[in-house]
Amino acid sequence: MLLPSKKDLKTALDVFAVFQWSFSALLITTTVIAVNLYLVVFTPYWPVTVLILTWLAFDWKTPQRGGRRFTCVRHWRLWKHYSDYFPLKLLKTHDICPSRNYILVCHPHGLFAHGWFGHFATEASGFSKIFPGITPYILTLGAFFWMPFLREYVMSTGACSVSRSSIDFLLTHKGTGNMVIVVIGGLAECRYSLPGSSTLVLKNRSGFVRMALQHGVPLIPAYAFGETDLYDQHIFTPGGFVNRFQKWFQSMVHIYPCAFYGRGFTKNSWGLLPYSRPVTTIVGEPLPMPKIENPSQEIVAKYHTLYIDALRKLFDQHKTKFGISETQELEII
């Protein structure tokens, strides 16, 4: 009987690490609902479900109050396999002083923000060594915190809810050395997540600038080269039935339903896992922001423009290192 080689075993662990995170929301949600329905309908153990719901109500605001991270979870060896699968690489252009707080603004979102999760919700890329004295708080959809056990898993990585109250708390109640991480394009940017794309949803998104001004914290641009190369999408005929449905659905729930595909459990198979393609994230220079309690729209627009200029500069300085043409520019929509 032939045993798998060390290389084959490592490859299998890399694939499993990506699979378990990519589908954890679906698996945990399905399991929690099924088990609790069974307890309530078919057993006398319905009080267990009541206790779970009571805890959920009691703990409801924790994701908006700094979350509940577990350092040991962030250091799981599983995340190293997750990072090696692509692989992921995190680079900085400037040192970050831990005597201040920051808002790190990430681009592009991609379909599942794999790079951002690996870099900032785990220690697989060596965040604490690259940015000593800085505590990262990656912000994500509030829906991830609605389901018992899933919310615990997500919060254990240091993730918090992406809401105004959450950002206010992190920037005012946690001392200094905190980095609030927002992937500003959100799910609306998924429709532009195509290999080679450099299109960002940013033109009308200035709330993060207003928050930075109100707290007087620097904005840091970050760009993940390769994030949009992790999946392919089928593009439906513009104006056709499916395309109209996609746009209608996005207008209703702010999520663009994509017909995406990647690889399967083996390298050359078809499936819904991301392709094993490198993602390198460049963290730029902090952009200083004055503290203005109630900034006018003109002031917000001014610093929004300055931020976009800094992001373009970061992109242009590094794009050719990652196979992007010298003539290709960021498209801000």
UniProtKB/Swiss-Prot annotation:
<keyword id="KW-0444">Lipid biosynthesis</keyword>
<feature type="transmembrane region" description="Helical">
    <location>
        <begin position="130"/>
        <end position="150"/>
    </location>
</feature>
<dbReference type="GO" id="GO:0006640">
    <property type="term" value="P:monoacylglycerol biosynthetic process"/>
</dbReference>
<comment type="subunit">
    <text>Monomer.</text>
</comment>
<dbReference type="GO" id="GO:0001523">
    <property type="term" value="P:retinoid metabolic process"/>
</dbReference>
<protein>
    <recommendedName>
        <fullName>Acyl-CoA wax alcohol acyltransferase 2</fullName>
        <ecNumber>2.3.1.75</ecNumber>
        <ecNumber>2.3.1.76</ecNumber>
        <ecNumber>2.3.1.20</ecNumber>
    </recommendedName>
</protein>
<comment type="function">
    <text>Acyltransferase that catalyzes the formation of ester bonds between fatty alcohols and fatty acyl-CoAs to form wax monoesters. Shows a preference for medium chain acyl-CoAs from C12 to C16 in length and fatty alcohols shorter than C20, as the acyl donors and acceptors, respectively. Also possesses acyl-CoA retinol acyltransferase (ARAT) activity that preferentially esterifies 11-cis-retinol, a chromophore precursor of bleached opsin pigments in cone cells. Shows higher catalytic efficiency toward 11-cis-retinol versus 9-cis-retinol, 13-cis-retinol, and all-trans-retinol substrates.</text>
</comment>
<keyword id="KW-0472">Membrane</keyword>
<dbReference type="GO" id="GO:0050252">
    <property type="term" value="F:retinol O-fatty-acyltransferase activity"/>
</dbReference>
<dbReference type="GO" id="GO:0003846">
    <property type="term" value="F:2-acylglycerol O-acyltransferase activity"/>
</dbReference>
<keyword id="KW-0812">Transmembrane</keyword>
<comment type="similarity">
    <text>Belongs to the diacylglycerol acyltransferase family.</text>
</comment>
<dbReference type="InterPro" id="IPR007130">
    <property type="entry name" value="DAGAT"/>
</dbReference>
<dbReference type="GO" id="GO:0006629">
    <property type="term" value="P:lipid metabolic process"/>
</dbReference>
<keyword id="KW-0808">Transferase</keyword>
<dbReference type="GO" id="GO:0036155">
    <property type="term" value="P:acylglycerol acyl-chain remodeling"/>
</dbReference>
<dbReference type="GO" id="GO:0010025">
    <property type="term" value="P:wax biosynthetic process"/>
</dbReference>
<dbReference type="Pfam" id="PF03982">
    <property type="entry name" value="DAGAT"/>
</dbReference>
<keyword id="KW-0443">Lipid metabolism</keyword>
<dbReference type="GO" id="GO:0004144">
    <property type="term" value="F:diacylglycerol O-acyltransferase activity"/>
</dbReference>
<dbReference type="GO" id="GO:0005789">
    <property type="term" value="C:endoplasmic reticulum membrane"/>
</dbReference>
<dbReference type="GO" id="GO:0047196">
    <property type="term" value="F:long-chain-alcohol O-fatty-acyltransferase activity"/>
</dbReference>
<feature type="transmembrane region" description="Helical">
    <location>
        <begin position="15"/>
        <end position="35"/>
    </location>
</feature>
<feature type="transmembrane region" description="Helical">
    <location>
        <begin position="38"/>
        <end position="58"/>
    </location>
</feature>
<keyword id="KW-0256">Endoplasmic reticulum</keyword>
<keyword id="KW-0012">Acyltransferase</keyword>
<keyword id="KW-1133">Transmembrane helix</keyword>
